[in-house]
Every structure is written in structure tokens, then in C-alpha cells.
Amino acid sequence: MRIILITGISGSGKSVALNVLEDAGYYCVDNLPAQFIPELTRYLDSQGYTHLGVATDIRSRESLDQLPDTVRALAAEHQVEVVFLTASTDALVQRYSETRRRHPLSVRTDGVPGPGGEPAFNDTALMEAIEMERALLSPLAEAAHRIDTSNVRTNTLRSWIKELIRDDSQRLTLLFESFGFKHGVPSDADMVFDVRSLPNPYYDLALRPLTGRDTPVIDFLQAQPMVLAMAEDIRAYVEKWLPSFIADNRSYLTVAIGCTGGQHRSVYIAERLANYFRAHGNVLVRHRELAPAG
């Protein structure tokens, strides 16, 4: 059975991820304590189910300490992947402000009602709750595939989750992600490469509205020896250290490529690397600052 465990910071998009799994045919359960996952797995296995999606988070905090052992036990018989969703504190505070939902660890701090008569919560208390949750969940994040949703739209997150579940192979999945430094470095990256020193197509008015996936931009960058040299150096570095990540039983390795805006240079380099490494196994590519293709 393929089991995908969705966990992470409240408000980071776990419900969206679980809905994608459900739409893909996974048997899904939300807020299931860790100690019940093996029992559910045995039952579903006996009934012929082949895909299970479980969301577990701080709402079941009494059992979170058991999750690493649970994952190791399940992995002996099943294909198990843990996806940890996170976001910046500022992004989470904004989301809670927009939805007026209560953080699981927040406490009511005043009696002043919100605009619709709902209970109001102090932003300081909310930020403390978020940081407390972040600290409590940090051991889970270290052993999971992390996805930072801070600057990510809902439809983009759906697209990313669909990509992650597309291939049922148990081999390590290599993910190349382009991003713009002006929007922040992805917190889910295992390796980060800065390509801002490369010639920038942005300054060519004909290329400015295009992206690193468009032929004119590709032709421009491929004509620059400096671009090809840096792409080759990054390729060699990733290829040299990839076996150590495989030996560490990692499910995913995220390689982030950053330029200023995440539109031209980083997109081109990420696509070039992905095309090379596809011969080595499972490869995904995503462009954080671009709308999902299709």
C-alpha cells in the first residue's frame, strides 16, 4: 500500500493536500492520531485498498511523539511518504485574519468581538501559538518532504501535490524548483543555488514578458558561456552528492535555483537540470513564481 502522511503547520494547506489525495482515489482520513494509523492500514489492506492518505497535526499532539516510530514500522511493509507543509509566520497570520478561524493552540485574549460578532484573538497570541506549534513539530519536519506554501496560491499547491503523487515508484524523487530571491528563499529546499550573477534577459524588452521556458529566452541564455558553465557546475555538484541522499533513504531531494524574480534564469536552469537528471530516475520540476502550466 502507498501511504502518504500529510502533516505540518496549521493554516499551511493540509486540507488542500488531503483533498487532492482524495480526488486521486486515496482513502483519506483527517486528524487521525498516530497510534490508530497501523490499525487502519491493516484493515484497509485486508479490504483491498492500495492508497491511503492521512492528515495528522497538532490537533492530535498527544500522539505526535509516536509518529516517527509509526512511520518506521509501516515502512517495513508499505511505501510510506511524509509531506510536511509549512509557511512563514506573516503568511499564516494573514490567513487566519482572512478566515477568522482559531489556531488550535491559540487562547482567547480579549472580549472584543470581530466584525461579524465572532470571537477576536490577539495577533501576538496567535504568533506565539504559531511559533509554539513550529517548535513542537520541528522533529517531524526534519524527516519529511517539506513544502513551503508562504507565497503559493491554492491551485499551485494542488498542482504540486498532484506531481508528488503521480509516480508510485519507491526511488528517490529529485525536485528542481525555481524561485525569485525577492520573494524569499523556499524553506523546503535541501540545496539552494544563486544564479543572479548570470546575464539577465529581463533587460531585453523583447524577452522581458517571456519566461525561461520560452524559446527566445532559452536561445539567449544558451548563447552565454557563463550560463552553461554555471549549469554544468550545479549539475556536477548535485550528481556527486545525490548518492548520499539516496543512501539516507530520502523520498525527495529538493534543489532550489534562484534568480531575482524567478522568471527567466532560474526557470531555464531548473528545466535544464531536470532534463538531464530524468535519465537517472524520478524527476519533478516546479516554478514557484510562475502560474502552473495548463
UniProtKB/Swiss-Prot annotation:
GO molecular function: ATP binding; GTP binding
SUPFAM superfamilies named among the record's database cross-references: P-loop containing nucleoside triphosphate hydrolases
InterPro entries: P-loop_NTPase (IPR027417), RapZ-like (IPR005337), RapZ-like_N (IPR053930), RapZ_C (IPR053931)
Pfam families in the cross-refs: PapZ_C, RapZ-like_N
Nucleotide-binding recorded as keyword: yes
Residue sites binding GTP per the record: D57, I58, R59, S60
Keywords: ATP-binding, GTP-binding, Nucleotide-binding
Residue positions binding ATP: G8, I9, S10, G11, S12, G13, K14, S15
Cited function: Displays ATPase and GTPase activities.
Family the entry assigns: Belongs to the RapZ-like family.
Protein name, UniProt field: Nucleotide-binding protein H16_A0381
Biological source species: Cupriavidus necator (strain ATCC 17699 / DSM 428 / KCTC 22496 / NCIMB 10442 / H16 / Stanier 337)
Lineage of origin: Bacteria, Pseudomonadati, Pseudomonadota, Betaproteobacteria, Burkholderiales
